[in-house]
Amino acid sequence: MASDNCKGIVKMGSYFGYAVAVTDINNDGYDDLVVGAPTFMRPGFSGRLEELGKVYVYLQRGPLHLQPAQTHLLGSQVFGRFGTSLAPLGDLNQDGFNDMAIGCPYGGDHQQGLVFIHNGHAGGLKNRPTQVLSGQWASSSFPASFGFALRGNMDIDQNGYPDLIVGAFGLDKAVLYRARPIVRASASLTVQPTMFNQEEKTCSLVKQDKNISVSCASTRFCLEAHGKHLPSHLVFVVEVQLDSAKQNQKESVRRALFLESQQPTLVKTLNLTNGERFCCETKIYLRLIL
C-alpha cells in the first residue's frame, strides 16, 4: 500500500518501499529520501490500469522533516517495473546537485531492461532522464533483468567522476559504466567592420598570378574550455562557415570567402589546456561576382 502524495489517494499493491535510497539531492546539507514503487498502476487511455512503476522523492527541509518534492517520477514502460532499484550517483554533471539511477529491469522493446539517469535540481529530481542505458547486448531468449541491481557513487577508474555498476541477474553479469569528465566550452565570433563597404578595397587577393583589390573585414574567433579533473590537453576541431545559409542550396554562390584559402570554410585543430582561452584572427573578403 502506498499513499500517492500528489493526489492523496491510497494505491494498493504498488510495492511502495521495494527500493529505498538516501542522498542529498538538492545539496542543502540534509539527506533526502527516494522511494521506489515498481508496480504502481494508473488508468491508461482505454481506462484499464497500466502498471508503470513510480519513484517518490521526499526532500528533508529540516531534521526529520520530510516533504514531497514538486514532482514524482512516473515510469513510461508498461510492466517495466520502474523503480525496482535505486542508486545515488553523486554529482555526475558537476552542477552542484546529486543525481540518481533508476532501474527498470523489464523495460525496453524486448523487455531486456533499462536504467534511467535523472539529474538533481533544487526541487528534487528532473522529470526527464538525461540518459537511458539499455541491455541490448543481452540475449533475447531469456529476460536479462538489466538494471535489477545498481551501485553508484564510486570512482572506480579514479578519474574524479563517479561510476555506475548495473547488474543483470538473468545473465549472471554486471556492467561497469564509467563517467566521462565534463568539459564546458564557450566560443565567440566577431567581425569588424560588421558590413562590407564595396567602395573600400583594402585587401589584396592573388588570383591567377594577378593582384586584385577586394573589400575585406577582420574576423576573430575565440574558444575557451574548462572543467574538473580534465586531461592536461584538450583537442578541439573548429569549423567556421561563411554565408552558411547557402551551404545546401544548389547552384548558389557564397559571396564571402576567407582571404588566405579563398574558400567559404575554415577548419582548425586546436590544442588547449584547461582554462585557456585561444583566439584566432583572419581576413574575409567580398567575392567579386562577374
Model features per residue range: what roles?
Residues 163, 178-290:
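A structural signal for beta-rich interaction modules in eukaryotic proteins
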